[in-house]
Amino acid sequence: MHLILFIIFLISLPFAAEGEILRLNRDEFIETALKNEPRFQETRMAVLAKEGRVEQIKAGALLPKFELSMLTGVVPGLRKETDYYGQEVKAWDFTKMGPYFGMNIQAAQPLNFGQLQLGLRAARADLQQKKMEIEGKEQFLKVHLLSYYYGYLLAKEMNKLAQDGHKQMRKAADNLEEALDDGDEDASQMDLLELKAGFFEIDKAVLEAKSGLKKAQLAAKFALSLPDEVSFQPADSVLAAVADFVPDLDSLKNWAYMHHPDIRRLTAGLEATSMQMELASARMAPEFFIMGEFEYAKSWAGDRTSLSKNAFAQDPVNKLSGAFGVGIKYRLNFWNQWENYKLARIEHRILRQTESYANRGIELQIEEKYEDFLVAKSKLESARNALRATEGMLKGAAMQYDLNPSKTSGLLASAYKKNLLMKKDYYFAVYEYNMAVARLFAQAGY
């Protein structure tokens, strides 16, 4: 029984030591990494603060001042006395303390609804400006994260190529050694030495591929904020060219004019500064408001005559009063509002100046990235055609090797080496093409 438990324990050790693997496709990787980006967490909190500012302005449009105050305690009573002139007066009676209750209600409603609307529109434009700022940063952060994802797939392909190359070179060397041992006259010792000399490059490639794969794994874990016991694996098994449709240059420009985050942020900023100018100008005018107040106080102290029994009787303690009217407030320090107006006007002019060249600058950047995309696309097509050619050469060399292994081993090794190097160049071309598409889309805000 103890032996069986020991065997089960030994079998379960590899499974217990194996960490958890997180498999994500490209879009899931980007989404998860963006959620775990600490800098964007802070920026999103700033967006929430601006959303709260909008709600605060909306809530303050109706009865911004609506206060209720209440007080309860103990006060002295009142008694009637005759003064020096023989008149009856009321005096405090501290021998008869009693409970006291008082309340005061104040309410005010501004009538300058135009200013409230301007403030609300300015706050909404400021919120939109912040959202577009985040969206623009996310576009370029996605490019950085895509380099992690595609770089991981590229490292996997390089590792597979290096391992396969090492395996095939070892197999060719073993076959050549067998031919030499069998006394095959067509087998050459120089060919064997040449093969063995090439092992240094293969071993170097294997080590570099393993190191690159490890670095790519660490970069992906850092982007995803994964703990040490969790590793990342891309859902894609091979590095392939993205199938995303790439519009023509004019379509990308037209899209950018309408949807580019920087342009939309600039538009929102212009609207915000325009509203701030109007708001500063409006605040130099008087503000009208409606105000009301109600006050009630009652004491149950002193004598129990009709005055104290009447809930609305008024005396030095008991009160019942109210007021309602229309008021006006005028800011006499108009120079302060004038400075606010000038500041908003300067900021608005700066954004207007930026607008004059922003569209052209974005257009030129899109043209530059589109040219990079066309170059990467041409290189990928060229690499794909060259890869097909080396695969044909490899098949031909393999057929000749099957007919006469001893005489064609060098030809097979040369063809395999060319095919291996071409595969490496092809996968790098795929990586550059995918990144060129990502940079183009980010630049156009697509």
Where are these regions (language model features)?
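Structural signature of outer-membrane beta-barrel domains
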Residues: 71-77, 114, 171, 295-299, ...
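Terminal intrinsically disordered/low-complexity segments used for targeting and assembly
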Residues: 1-32, 69, 82-87, 207-255, ...
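Periplasmic alpha-helical coiled-coil/stalk elements that build and connect Gram-negative outer-membrane
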Residues: 132-134, 138-255, 372, 376, ...
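Amphipathic alpha-helical coiled-coil segments
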Residues: 42-57, 137, 141-162, 198, ...
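A glycine-/polar-enriched beta->alpha junction
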Residues: 31-41, 48-65, 93, 97, ...
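Small/polar, glycine/serine/threonine/aspartate-rich low-complexity segments that form flexible
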Residues: 21-22, 67-108, 237-245, 278, ...
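Bacterial Sec-pathway N-terminal export signals of envelope proteins
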Residues: 16-77, 124, 187-189, 228, ...
